[in-house]
Design a protein with these regions (language model features):
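Bacterial N-terminal signal peptides that target proteins for export
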Residues: 1-9
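PEST-like low-complexity, intrinsically disordered acidic/proline/serine-rich tracts
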Residues: 9, 20-344
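Hydrophobic membrane-targeting signal helices
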Residues: 13-19
Length: 344
């Protein structure tokens, strides 16, 4: 009997320290070589705004009732008419939402903003030099165009002389939500992570971008080599994957708050991203933007990604994209009208 009790106690102790796969218990799966397993497809869309709305003032978290009401408002908005009241206005956007993501989730902790530092939930102020450059650019719309979508070109405020006068995502160069850094968007908000012993691949659905991140401690490439996605190097900090990126091209922005805004230039950007498993179904993603040329202080964003069954299909951008061709053709037609008028 005593032997049976001892064996039973030993089994219970063993079970107590064995990992389980229960959802929500903070269990972190491992790869065969012992690293935290971040692999899978992760949906990073969220209703939580980047910056804290003014009505919440210094409050960092929503109540359950407020969170429920926010979700309900979004669900009701799906039935709104997208057409302009004036039938003569542009019909762009006047169609249903079959191609957009159905976003009904807030951040798991019900935060009022994705920005967690500074505590006020707002983007830091621009430096004086960055502000002056921003104002000068908006007055002239000169190249390079760093915005993902340039509304001035779409609405004829800045007639397109060439494709360089359109936004970067319209030219299939940079997706505003896929980053880096990664932010929720209207659609294609999926990240797939692949791992080997020496590398991690971060593949985003938008613009089908793949960042291959070495983990072997090699230095960054020369600052003379500038890239749209920067030069990334990774390492493990406990169970958290840390990815640091520098050497961004000045042709892109330092930060993209949304699809139409571009803040600063990427040349001085130092981006630090942190990926960690919360549980089987949840991945936490944090990033810190440190750009002393653009912002008066660094800021940090935190969001949670939910596991998705997938698969991720290849993102078609140039294929069947007649919008850019038609916009350029329209600009040439306007020029002919002006030239004919002047020559009379």
């Amino acid at each position: 009997m005593r032997r049976l009790l001892v064996m039973t106690a030993a089994v219970l102790m063993l079970l107590g320290v064995m990992p389980t796969t229960a959802v929500g218990q903070g269990v972190i799966p491992k790869t065969p070589w012992g690293a935290p397993d971040l692999q899978g497809i992760w949906d990073f869309n969220t209703l939580t705004p980047l910056e804290r709305p003014s009505e919440f003032e210094e409050r960092e978290f929503l109540t359950e009732e407020e969170a429920s009401q926010m979700v309900q408002t979004v669900l009701e908005s799906e039935g709104w008419d997208a057409r302009y009241s004036d039938p003569q206005q542009d019909v762009e956007g006047a169609y249903n939402q079959f191609w957009t993501d159905r976003i009904t989730n807030l951040s798991a902790d019900r935060r009022t903003s994705l920005i967690v530092k500074p505590r006020d939930g707002q983007l830091p102020a621009l430096t004086a030099a960055a502000y002056e450059r921003e104002q000068a650019w908006r007055a002239t719309w000169q190249r390079p165009i760093r915005a993902p979508v340039l509304l001035a070109a779409l609405f004829g405020i800045n007639p397109a002389r060439g494709p360089e006068d359109f936004g970067l995502s319209e030219r299939c160069l940079v997706g505003y939500s896929s980053g880096p850094p990664i932010n929720g968007g209207t659609y294609n908000s999926n990240l797939q992570i692949f791992q080997t012993r020496g590398h991690v691949v971060l593949y985003t659905e938008m613009i089908h971008e793949a960042r291959v991140v070495p983990l072997d401690g090699r230095p960054h490439v020369s600052p003379a080599i500038r890239q749209w996605l920067g030069d990334a190097r990774g390492h493990w900090d406990g169970d958290t994957l840390v990815v640091e990126s520098v050497n961004f091209t000045p042709k892109r922005a330092s930060f993209y708050p949304n699809a139409t805004d571009a803040v600063g230039s990427g040349e001085a950007l130092h981006l630090t991203e942190r990926f960690s498993r919360v549980d089987i179904e949840t991945l936490r993603y944090e990033y810190t933007v440190d750009d002393p040329v653009t912002f008066t202080s660094p800021f940090t964003v935190s969001l949670t990604m939910q596991r998705s069954t997938g698969p991720i299909f290849e993102y078609a951008c140039h294929e069947g994209n007649y919008g850019l061709l038609n916009a350029l053709a329209g600009a040439r037609a306007q020029e002919r009208v002006v030239n004919n008028f002047v020559s009379r």
